[in-house]
Amino acid sequence: MVSFSSILLACSAAIGALATPIEPLADHPNEAFNETAFNDLVGRSTPSSTGYNNGYYYSFWTDGGGDVTYTNGNGGSYSVQWSNVGNFVGGKGWNPGSSRAITYSGSFNPSGNGYLAVYGWTTDPLIEYYIVESYGTYNPGSGGTYKGQVTSDGGTYNIYTSVRTNAPSIIGTATFTQFWSVRTSKRVGGTVTTGNHFNAWAKYGLTLGTHNYQIVATEGYQSSGSSAITVY
């Protein structure tokens, strides 16, 4: 894909996360199986999961590449450390999502490709959306169609849309639309009034459906870094 959004979520429909198939060991009959090395490799990363922690919904998904550790903290806090990952996304928030003002604080330090965003899904229609507060070396808007701008919470966001065809989603492999608001001046911390973005998207014909989950997410793609975020 052009951006990270291929990340998303279908490791199983139940947890709303994607999975990338792993090449079976049987395809390499001449390679000796080292169980200790294999267990060390798998054990480096936190497994994909979803659920509730200290009153907040959380979602964490990884394709298993590289080393990524996701840790739920007190209240709405979580942290992620990653090194030479394939792809992951995780964070805390709510299920279902809604048009709410989300306040968050913390740190976000990607080395390479990474996003810090309010992230969520809707169904009927199936939409994957990002309100991007900060990013690393790749501006996700560069892969979409520019629609306009919205001014909210002391900043200007460029609005983009893109279509994913036969891609993983919260309901399995599907074709769906992505909505993006990308802040022109990066920040880590503040309030995101999601309703302002939802209304602006609707103005440009980008209509959300019934909300599924909504989190303040850290995402990494073929990169390293660290993040520590608290959602209020």
Swiss-Prot record:
Q: In which pathway does it act?
A: Glycan degradation; xylan degradation
Reported EC number(s) for this entry are 3.2.1.8
- A cellular component term (GO) from this record? extracellular region
Under InterPro entries, the record lists: ConA-like_dom_sf (IPR013320), GH11/12 (IPR013319), GH11_AS_1 (IPR018208), GH11_AS_2 (IPR033119), GH11_dom (IPR033123), Glyco_hydro_11 (IPR001137)
Q: How sensitive is activity to pH? A: Optimum pH is 6.0. Retains over 95 percent activity in the pH range from 5.0 to 7.0, and 70 percent activity in the pH range from 4.0 to 8.0.
Positions glycosylated per UniProt = N34
Instruction: Tell me the keywords, alphabetical order.
Output: Carbohydrate metabolism, Glycoprotein, Glycosidase, Hydrolase, Polysaccharide degradation, Secreted, Signal, Xylan degradation
Q: Which Pfam families match?
A: Glyco_hydro_11 (PF00457)
Q: How does activity depend on temperature?
A: Optimum temperature is 58 degrees Celsius. Has complete stability at 60 degrees Celsius.
Q: Which residues form the signal peptide?
A: 1-19
Please state the protein's primary subcellular location: secreted
Q: Where is the GH11 domain?
A: 44-232
One of the entry's Gene Ontology molecular-function terms is:
endo-1,4-beta-xylanase activity
Going by the entry's taxonomy, the superkingdom of the source organism is recorded as Eukaryota
Q: Can you say where in the cell this protein is located?
A: Secreted
- Catalytic machinery residues: E128, E219
User: Is Secreted among the key words of this record?
Assistant: yes
Which reactions appear under catalytic activity for this entry?
Answer: Endohydrolysis of (1->4)-beta-D-xylosidic linkages in xylans
GO BP term (any one): xylan catabolic process
Record's miscellaneous remark: The promoter contains two 5'-GGCTAAA-3' sequences identified as binding sites for the xylanolytic transcriptional activator xlnR.
What the protein does comes down to: Endo-1,4-beta-xylanase involved in the hydrolysis of xylan, a major structural heterogeneous polysaccharide found in plant biomass representing the second most abundant polysaccharide in the biosphere, after cellulose.
PANTHER family the record matches: ENDO-1,4-BETA-XYLANASE A-RELATED
The family classification in the record reads: Belongs to the glycosyl hydrolase 11 (cellulase G) family.
UniProt name for this protein: Endo-1,4-beta-xylanase A
Species of origin reads Aspergillus oryzae (strain ATCC 42149 / RIB 40)
